[in-house]
């Protein structure tokens, strides 16, 4: 009788246990994106009509880069680029060269170059903080185009494996 109780208890234990499948919803998960990559975090932002949404541009698991050109396409009918500021990835003994160009047509170019004594950076970090303001309700997409580039210290291209996308929703 006692062994039957153990079998029943063990049976309930196995039946009641649920094996959970992992959810990879973090943009910076390596299982979610192949490095080296340029990505946005958060991938989805919600704000009010006329409100602002901040998005960070990240370099994921890059090796020996000296510069970045990020070309971001956004829905100019629904979004305005309010501000763009340098991230901390290229910070060092000298401030990075950081330039951006946005004429309101839906293309934002960000250029950032490392000026530290070792001339290259490796790892994961934030390149820029971009604040968008909404003009119309609904979803507006943002995406890094294949014209984006990672450069080594000799100006040679480093292939990018993953390009980030995002959505900004105005309610």
What are these regions (language model features)?
Residues 17-171:
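Acidic, low-complexity intrinsically disordered segments
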């Amino acid at each position: 009788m006692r062994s039957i109780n153990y079998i029943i208890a063990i049976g309930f234990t196995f039946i009641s246990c649920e094996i959970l499948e992992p959810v990879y919803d973090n943009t910076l998960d390596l299982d979610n994106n192949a490095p080296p990559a340029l990505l946005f975090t958060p991938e989805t932002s919600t704000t009010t009509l006329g409100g602002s949404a901040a998005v960070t541009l990240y370099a994921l698991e890059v090796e020996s880069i000296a510069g970045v050109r990020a070309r971001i396409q956004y829905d100019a009918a629904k979004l305005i680029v309010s501000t763009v500021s340098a991230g901390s990835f290229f910070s060092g003994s000298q401030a990075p060269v950081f330039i951006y160009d946005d004429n309101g047509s839906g293309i934002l170019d960000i250029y950032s170059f490392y000026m530290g004594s070792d001339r290259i950076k490796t790892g994961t970090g934030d390149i820029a903080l971009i604040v968008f303001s909404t003009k119309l309700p609904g979803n507006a997409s943002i995406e890094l185009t294949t014209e984006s580039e990672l450069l080594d210290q000799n100006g040679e291209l480093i292939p990018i494996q993953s390009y980030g996308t995002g959505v900004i929703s105005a309610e």
